[in-house]
């Protein structure tokens, strides 16, 4: 797969489709982009070019642990720089969960570069913030405190990053544990500060100021709650909201975790909704 040097790290990326308006999609958590290939292929069939990439610290891209703002802000600026290198601006930006946070931060930081937002499984609320802060940051800080960078390299996530790009081990081992812990703590604190926001990553005022068209698909689990999606849809002035893509569940009976199989089975419907919004936004409908 092609690679690009972006803001001090090498990013692994792929473009699906050969012509048409540009789209960038990003998965949730720190997962590789590969799960989004089938959805991207469906969009490409309708004449769009889809940019997929592994974010820094994810998949086959380089590790880059830097204490500059939040991790999601770094990811958003990386994607903007990568898309600029490829001549892919402006573009529709989308993603699920962490990828949706990236997309919203991209729009807040680079509004002139965004044609529209394609969002599914938005994250919000105290339960989600506490759970994910531990998953993304606290556990790794504890590993570094107990066993140094050797322990971090042996973790499930970073061992996968090393398997995908062996040079990542040397990059991690070159870090002082104290600096690694400082950055994890900084990123954790930035994440925890979002517990009372409508969604993780944006205030009410910021959401109201996003004027581009938005397709927003609600989740049905305790991390990606329908309440969070409804709040965001009510604040985004040009949002088209869908809460019937996956099984609708009452707010007091949500799944503990999202169901990957359920979401995969709904990809044709997700593609249909995204294509409808993009066709209208580009005048192709």
Which sequence ranges carry the predicted segments?
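Conserved alpha/beta-hydrolase "acid-adjacent" motif
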Residues: 222-228
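Hydrophobic, aromatic-rich cap/lid helix
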Residues: 171-203
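Conserved HGGG/HGGXW glycine-rich cap/lid loop of the alpha/beta-hydrolase fold
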Residues: 8-62
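Flexible "cap/lid" loop of the alpha/beta hydrolase fold
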Residues: 104, 108-109, 114-145
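Active-site loop/oxyanion-hole signature of alpha/beta-hydrolase fold enzymes
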Residues: 52-91, 257-266
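Catalytic active-site module of serine/aspartate enzymes centered on a nucleophile-bearing elbow/loop
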Residues: 239-285
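Short beta-strand/loop motif that positions the catalytic acidic residue
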Residues: 210, 216-218
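Gly/Ala-rich beta-loop-alpha elbow adjacent to hydrolase catalytic centers
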Residues: 95-99, 103
